[in-house]
A protein has these predicted regions:
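Conserved ATP-binding/catalytic motifs of P-loop helicase motor domains
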Residues: 1-148
Length: 148
């Protein structure tokens, strides 16, 4: 039987009942992965789980950030031709299905967020702003930090 963790229960209830962001961190073995599994199994929210590496994505039951957002592996420079969609060598076009997934998503979980470069977070933010309803005040994100 799984032991109850009051802090994780509080975080779960907070996520379920608010639309605000949380940053979940903790040492190895504190229940972060169990929390994510419980969240995926029991939450009615439509969520996407991404991670910076293939191994982290598999462990979280998600996909890589680059795969989901169709990002190149080089650095992302806000305001650049790539960011504005003017770079002909990098045509950023999501399928209608992908756009619908992004627009209908209630929760974006970024597992192992401490491994994500700042420019990649900018790219994610820009993609969400571009494809989601612009009337929403914030994208809803959850980051689970990697600590060994």
């Amino acid at each position: 039987m799984m032991q109850t963790n009051l802090q994780l229960d509080l975080a779960f209830n907070y996520l379920e009942n608010t639309g605000t962001n949380i940053f979940l961190t903790g040492k190895a073995g504190t229940g972060k992965t169990t929390f994510l599994k419980k969240l995926k199994e029991t939450s009615p929210k439509r969520m996407i789980v991404v991670a910076p590496t293939g191994v982290a994505a598999i462990n979280a039951g998600g996909v890589t950030i680059h795969s989901f957002f169709q990002l190149p592996f080089g650095p992302y420079i806000p305001g650049s031709e790539m960011a504005s969609g003017q770079n002909k060598s990098y045509s950023h076009k999501f399928s209608r299905d992908k756009i619908n997934i992004i627009r209908s998503m209630d929760l974006l979980v970024i597992d192992e967020v401490s491994m994500v470069r700042a420019d990649l977070l900018d790219a994610i933010s820009d993609m969400l702003r571009r494809y989601r309803d612009r009337n929403r005040s914030e994208e809803r994100r959850v980051g689970k930090e990697c600590r060994s």
